[in-house]
Amino acid sequence: MNTVKRSLLFFVIALSIVVNARQAQAQSGVELENVKADVQFGEQILFTATIKALIPIQGVSIMIVDESQALSRLEPLTVQSDGRTEFRLDTKKTILRPFTNVTWSYQVALNDGSTVQSDSFSVRYVDNRFNWQTLESGTLHVNWYNGDANFGQAALNAVQSGLQSTSRLMALDLASPIDVYIYASADDLRGTLFSGGEDWVAGHANPALGVVMVVVEPGAEQSITMEQRIPHELMHVMMYRSVGVGYNNIPAWLREGTATLAEVFPNADYDRILASAAAGNGLIPIKDLCASFPADAGTAFLAYAESRSFTKYLHDTYGSTGLLNLAAYYADGVECERGTERAFGVSLSNLEVNWRSSVLGQNAFLPALQNIAPYLVLLCLVLIIPLIGMVSARRKKGKPNEPETFVRKQ
């Protein structure tokens, strides 16, 4: 069952439960008071409520749902004599995406054998380690904690510039909110990422949530940094809204390539490191950038530079429509090396050869040889091993009385 069908089934079942539960709740006199969820980001969410009923309560469970991942868990609760309950969700062990919506409800089993399902409640898993300031424009929300009002306005300007840049590649979808969170240091941002993230990570997006997180330190370079990093992450959100839940099937080189093209002020070192790698025959094969980028900072930067240049080549050759068609094929599950064949009628390896030749001025023979090198090695093995056998047999045939060589044991 695919993700869309699973989510729809989940919604239908949940709606059915709530409708039936409201009728049962009214009949049984179950009441919930002081329902709260206290978030301690990176540590826990504490769910508390006081539950009372006209019929004695046999047991209570809490149903917690992570909407962004369509995951749920059902946990039994202890009910105190005064009806109080609490449950601590350890967010160090249970992975929650930053700023995701968490919903919860209560299932109350009564002594008469009936079960009552409460209404659902919701809390946002906000990074409350900081006191956020907020500036809004329509569905665009900019949040920061280090810097004055001018800093926030500069960030909002960067969002709008980034959307204008993105609109040259695809239609914008601003129907749902976009929340941009600006962190003052890489360490602060890494505190939001599941595994801490690499040291060089300066931005992250949760496209399904419409959440963008970037590192920008207040100072003379803040506007340039904003117009590099914010548009980059915004493109991830727009691409997700364009292709839907198949977004994660898109190769890393195309996701990051389109994101770097959206940067208003792209990093000037992209071209330098790309030219150096091309001259030294140190380019990363594009097929090696399908699943993910390298963890090493230097190699990762080269991966970004290559992806930007290769994606720009595709855009210049096939236009925005061609690029979006390619993304759509990938989102539908087409394999990395087959997607370009479906969209353009050309293999990924041949497109790479053309890109290296026309954009980087590299001899087309080198990448072609690199692509077929494993097959050449295999061919040599297939030919050489029988040849060695034939030579050995002819030598033995020419000297029939010569004894075989052996090593005497001492």
Regions found by a protein language model. Give the residues of each.
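Bacterial N-terminal signal peptides that target proteins for export
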Residues: 1-9
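Short, intrinsically disordered terminal tails adjacent to the first/last structured region
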Residues: 4, 39, 45, 57, ...
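Bacterial N-terminal signal peptides
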Residues: 10-18
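Glycan-association/targeting regions that enable binding to alpha-glucans and other polysaccharides
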Residues: 24-131
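Juxtacatalytic substrate-recognition/specificity segment
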Residues: 131-247, 251, 292-293, 335-339
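Acidic/His/Gly-enriched intrinsically disordered linker/tail segments
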Residues: 199-212, 224-229, 234-237, 241-372, ...
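C-terminal single-pass membrane-anchor helix
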Residues: 364-409
